[in-house]
Amino acid sequence: MIGLFKVKEKQREQAQNATRGGASVKKQSAGELRLHKDISELNLPSSCSISFPNGKDDLMNFEVSIKPDDGYYHNGTFVFTFQVSPVYPHEAPKVKCKTKVYHPNIDLEGNVCLNILREDWKPVLNINTVIYGLFHLFTEPNSEDPLNHDAAAVLRDNPKLFETNVRRAMTGGYVGQTFFPRCI
């Protein structure tokens, strides 16, 4: 909460300087303020990291890298883009997987099937919750609510073949007719 007061105080100072002939100041939306708070309070596992490809001035667009330390996706690196709306937290962030991955809950275009990004989103949830949800998809892929129906069927019917397909995809190879770039 103290960080929020500091942000507000800094905004007031900048606004006063602007009225005295200083440079114009962009007013932060409530969504930006909440996101700033969420990011400052992140408590990520060591296998997750966050970066700001557009610089720290663009908090509303960032990337999260997840490197699972166990399970089918062990040692792979998966990058997700986050686009956060100015009305956040009343609207869930838009999340896409930049890494092409053989996964029942992520399709080949990078769309992610995670209930808290859709119908189960609530304003009390935060970026930390979303990142943990994504991390959980790699430790416990879900064949019950798939985007990639082929991968889900293999996971459900033949887990050993699923594991082989995941390894083949992560080391850079074909699964069926689809090529997956190396992500290990």
Swiss-Prot record:
Q: Name one GO molecular function term.
A: NEDD8 transferase activity
Q: Which InterPro entries match?
A: UBQ-conjugat_E2_core, UBQ-conjugating_AS, UBQ-conjugating_enzyme/RWD
> Where, by tissue, is this protein expressed?
Expressed in shoot, root and floral meristems, and in vascular tissues of leaves.
KW Acetylation (keyword) present: no
Q: State the PROSITE patterns in the record.
A: UBC_1, UBC_2
Q: Which Pfam families match?
A: UQ_con
Keywords from the named record: ATP-binding, Nucleotide-binding, Transferase, Ubl conjugation pathway
Domain UBC core, chain residue ranges per copy: 30-175
Q: What is its EC number?
A: 2.3.2.-
Give the highest taxon in the source lineage. Answer: Eukaryota
Quote the catalytic residue positions.
C113 (glycyl thioester intermediate)
Q: Any other comment in the entry?
A: Reduction in RCE1 levels leads to reduced organ length and defects in gravitropism.
- Assembly and interaction partners: Interacts with RBX1.
Query: Could you tell me what this protein does?
Result: Accepts the ubiquitin-like protein NEDD8/RUB1 from the ECR1-AXR1 E1 complex and catalyzes its covalent attachment to other proteins.
Write down what this protein is called.
NEDD8-conjugating enzyme Ubc12
The gene coding this protein? RCE1
